[in-house]
């Protein structure tokens, strides 16, 4: 069982400690306490340890150094007994913590990433069983993490315009640096004061701090600039760009930005369940509270040049946004058995959320125009303006706002549940009356209002599962839900702080309704070691909230407003099958097939020469009232005068992944093949119809010599075809290798050398495609490098004459543990194992 997540501690479970393994679907805490199966299960792997080998210490240290100043260090230490476990873990690396093994294909992480993570995790119980009077369990964790990212990104995109016109094309290059620090902690107390009552209390806290800076260049063109020679972006920013390029150029922009944010929060939850008998009757209570407070600040400088004769736009902006949020909720539930295997439930929940946000934006480029020349109200001689006075003088009231939200939510859930060994069925409906109150101020647009919205949502849901056997089941799920547009989207306000993207609200927005359907079948045959999984899902949205874009041909300015639209739906099917064959099942074959179809719609509009934007109007509109009135009408006229066409983008995706593995005592090998095909059709811009392919094939092998040496290698050819930019149609031969040697009597010390992307052909390309645009991107990443690792593993067992296995206090024989952190009832991260829930084995003598 492996977990390569850099956010988790990585530890090892030693073979000598393991008595039995048990893989099964663990019931939820609610089911264990009430006896009512709520269907919320998690596949877990319990490791049963030998009691005589408890009170043990496991300590692992992994130090790694590489070329290009790469490093990777990990540390893990844990001590456990029959009733307790405490773990310390940490890691530092600037490799993205990729781990090793298995060919690496498309979809690598973005940017050059460095991270640090340290944590403490503990659990203790008093040895009493669940539901036993006086049972007490304590636990908790504290974690610190820091991540830094250096990202270089290049993007070329095509914005679909109306029929009969060409698309708009954009190119951008950006470099950004970001860092974030996160500290969080949680305590857990589970107590059963008597056999009928269960109490769970969990306080939490967190702190986050982030910083970022970026610089970028971008340009917009009337037609595809790749039809000309050279790099479009480099050429348009040259001292003397070619006339052929400037003739199709619309604008070019340079931008610098930096920002920071801080947030602190505390919270907690409490659950109380009281059983009123052994037949499933119970009452429950849940309380939850959270408070957070923070602020963010941003600085930005933008310089925009237009190619239609319009004056250049230069902005130097600063914004400051303090924010405070708190919320609480109270939930009461009652469950009543009314027939054999039938149970009725009713729940009521009240929740309140308060959010206060004050965004102030300042145009620092206007400082030069400040004068103290008012003869009627000049300040005393010798007085200088304060920082607050200077900022107030250049405050952008038009784009500054103050908003206070108050959310009052009520929820009543009525449901019935039927459950036996074969069939589980539950259905219910939720009634959600909600009231939202928004106090909103926007001085520059003469808006000072309080808006109250009342809605009543109804959400039905149904779940059905049929258990053919312990390892074969069918499941059907349906859910319908409503979502409301945000309150600010319903206000008739304008934000033109970005001269190239002007956004508006829309008071006419309607709620959306989403239907979600899922069908699944999973099965596993332990004797044949064969597992299968098949699934189908469908999602459809009515009155979806889409973003309508009106594009100005002359300037490249985009006007954006949310609008309702119908016709968005998607469906997908996927299946997996794997099985073992040959003598002792040393061969395994696995196949994963997926299919999806997305029907995406969006509004596209264009206008020719809208004229001046609000920032130029402001130069000659002296009255704030006149300016606000003019711009509301002006921008609304942009949308009403532009013909909105519905663009339909249909995308069909199909994929197949095949893997053949062979495993022997000292050698194992695998052969892989992957094929992904995407077929997209655009109703307006048929020239943007694409058929793209991604395919790869390769092999991997591991050799383990009896003297402690091992060799691992993998190689794969990855290819792309069908992209509009020829540089994206690539062939990449990726080869990784590792050589390691273990030392000392028990092989506790290991020296390994790992080499990634030996042939230096890895690239990082991605695509986004919807009804409004097509965007292809490249970014930098950690690709080709080597690492030298020194790994030491120490296991200290207590002395015991009753076990032949405990003949030494130190042992280097090990294997990786589940989820990286052994603990009471420890669960591996992620979802169900691909082969289904394997066979259950005997109860533990001691479990961690």
Where are these regions (language model features)?
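Primarily recognizes Gram-negative and organellar outer-membrane beta-barrels
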Residues: 8, 25-69, 84-848
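Short, small-residue-biased leader/transition segments that mark boundaries at the very start
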Residues: 1-14
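Phosphoinositide-dependent membrane-docking surfaces
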Residues: 17-24
């Amino acid at each position: 069982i492996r977990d390569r997540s850099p956010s988790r501690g990585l530890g090892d479970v030693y073979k000598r400690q393991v008595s039995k393994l048990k893989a099964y679907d663990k019931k939820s805490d609610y089911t264990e306490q009430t006896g009512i199966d709520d269907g919320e299960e998690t596949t877990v792997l319990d490791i049963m340890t030998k009691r005589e080998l408890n009170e043990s210490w496991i300590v692992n240290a992994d130090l790694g150094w590489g070329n290009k100043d790469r490093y990777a260090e990990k540390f893990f230490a844990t001590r456990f007994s029959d009733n307790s476990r405490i773990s310390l873990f940490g890691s530092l690396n600037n490799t993205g913590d990729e781990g090793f093994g298995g060919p690496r294909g498309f979809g690598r992480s973005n940017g050059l990433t460095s991270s640090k993570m340290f944590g403490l995790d503990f659990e203790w119980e008093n040895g009493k069983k669940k539901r036993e009077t006086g049972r007490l369990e304590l636990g908790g964790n504290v974690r610190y993490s820091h991540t830094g990212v250096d990202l270089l990104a290049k993007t070329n995109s095509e914005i679909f315009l109306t029929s009969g016109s060409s698309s708009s094309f954009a190119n951008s290059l950006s470099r950004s640096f970001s860092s974030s620090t996160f500290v969080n902690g949680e305590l857990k107390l589970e107590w059963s004061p008597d056999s009928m009552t269960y109490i769970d209390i969990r306080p939490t806290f967190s702190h986050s701090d982030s910083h970022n800076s970026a610089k970028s260049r971008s340009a917009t063109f009337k037609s595809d600039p790749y039809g000309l020679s050279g790099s479009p972006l480099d050429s348009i920013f040259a001292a003397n760009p070619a006339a052929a390029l400037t003739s199709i150029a619309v604008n070019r922009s340079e931008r610098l930005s930096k920002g920071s944010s801080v947030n602190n929060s505390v919270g907690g939850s409490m659950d109380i369940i009281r059983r009123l008998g052994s037949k499933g009757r119970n009452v429950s209570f849940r309380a939850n509270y959270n408070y957070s407070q923070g602020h963010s600040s941003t600085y930005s400088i933008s310089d925009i040049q237009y190619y239609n004769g319009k004056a250049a736009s230069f902005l130097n902006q600063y914004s400051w946004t303090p924010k405070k949020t708190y919320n609480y909720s109270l939930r009461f539930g009652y469950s009543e058995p009314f027939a054999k295997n039938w149970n009725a439930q009713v729940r009521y929940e009240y929740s309140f959320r308060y959010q206060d946000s004050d965004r102030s934006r300042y145009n620092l480029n206007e400082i030069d125009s400040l004068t103290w020349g008012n003869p009627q109200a000049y300040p005393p001689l010798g007085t200088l303006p304060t920082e607050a006075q200077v900022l107030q003088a250049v405050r952008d009231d038009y784009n500054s706002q103050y908003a206070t939200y108050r959310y009052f939510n009520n929820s009543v859930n009525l449901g019935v549940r039927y459950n036996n060994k074969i069939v589980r069925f539950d259905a219910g409906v939720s009634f959600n009356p909600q009231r939202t109150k928004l106090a909103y101020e926007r001085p520059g647009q003469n808006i000072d209002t309080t808006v109250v919205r009342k809605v009543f949502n109804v959400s039905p849901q149904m779940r059905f599962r049929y258990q053919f056997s312990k390892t074969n089941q069918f499941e059907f799920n349906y859910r319908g839900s409503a979502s409301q547009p945000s309150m600010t989207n319903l206000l008739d306000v304008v934000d033109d702080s970005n001269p190239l993207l002007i956004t508006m609200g829309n008071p006419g927005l309607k709620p959306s309704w989403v239907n979600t359907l899922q069908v699944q079948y999973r099965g596993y045959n332990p004797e044949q070691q064969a597992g299968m999984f098949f699934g189908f899902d469908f999602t459809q949205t009515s009155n979806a909230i889409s973003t309508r874009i009106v594009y100005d041909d002359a300037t490249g300015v985009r006007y954006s407003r949310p609008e309702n639209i119908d016709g968005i739906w998607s469906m997908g099917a996927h299946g997996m099958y794997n099985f073992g064959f040959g003598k002792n099942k040393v061969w395994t074959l696995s196949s994963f097939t997926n299919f999806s179809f997305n029907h995406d719609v969006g509004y596209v509009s264009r206008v020719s020469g809208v004229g001046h934007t609000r920032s130029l109007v402001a130069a000659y509109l002296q009255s704030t009232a006149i300016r606000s009135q003019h711009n509301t009408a002006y921008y609304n006229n942009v949308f009403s005068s532009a013909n909105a066409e519905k663009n339909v983008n249909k995308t069909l995706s199909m994929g197949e992944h095949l893997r053949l593995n062979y495993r022997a005592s000292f050698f194992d090998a695998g052969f892989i093949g992957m094929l992904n095909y995407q077929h997209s059709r655009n109703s307006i811009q048929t020239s943007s119809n694409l058929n793209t392919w991604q395919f790869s094939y390769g092999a991997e092998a591991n050799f383990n010599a009896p003297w402690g040496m091992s060799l691992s290698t993998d190689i794969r050819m990855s290819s792309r075809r069908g992209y509009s930019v020829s540089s994206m149609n690539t062939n990449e031969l990726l080869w990784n290798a590792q050589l390691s040697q273990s030392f000392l009597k028990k092989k506790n010390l290991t020296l390994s050398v790992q080499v990634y992307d030996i042939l230096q052909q890895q690239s990082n390309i991605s695509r986004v495609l919807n009804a409004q645009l097509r965007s292809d991107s490249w970014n930098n990443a950690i690709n080709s490098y080597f690492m030298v690792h020194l790994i030491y593993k120490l296991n200290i067992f207590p002395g015991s004459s009753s076990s032949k296995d405990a003949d030494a206090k130190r042992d280097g024989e090990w294997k990786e543990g589940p989820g990286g952190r052994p603990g009471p009832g420890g669960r591996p991260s992620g979802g169900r194992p691909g082969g289904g829930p394997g066979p259950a084995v005997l109860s533990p003598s001691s479990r961690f």
